[in-house]
Amino acid sequence: PKIRKVLVANRGEIAIRVMRTXKELGIATV
């Protein structure tokens, strides 16, 4: 269960990171 929670948390962090990088890239491209 603990590992599962960590995996879910990591997934959320990765998603946020990807969204942030995409936003930065989008702004930089535009």
Swiss-Prot record:
Optimum pH is 7.0-7.5. It is an enzyme of class 6 (ligase). InterPro entries: BC-like_N (IPR005481), Biotin_carboxylation_dom (IPR011764), PreATP-grasp_dom_sf (IPR016185). This is one of the 2 subunits of the biotin-dependent propionyl-CoA carboxylase (PCC), the enzyme catalyzing the carboxylation of propionyl-CoA/propanoyl-CoA to D-methylmalonyl-CoA/(S)-methylmalonyl-CoA. Within the holoenzyme, the alpha subunit catalyzes the ATP-dependent carboxylation of the biotin carried by the biotin carboxyl carrier (BCC) domain, while the beta subunit then transfers the carboxyl group from carboxylated biotin to propionyl-CoA. Propionyl-CoA carboxylase also carboxylates acetyl-CoA, butyryl-CoA and succinyl-CoA. Dodecamer composed of six biotin-containing alpha subunits and six beta subunits. Consists of an N-terminal biotin carboxylation/carboxylase (BC) domain that catalyzes the transient carboxylation of the biotin covalently attached to the C-terminal biotinyl-binding/biotin carboxyl carrier (BCC) domain. This is Propionyl-CoA carboxylase alpha chain. It comes from Myxococcus xanthus.
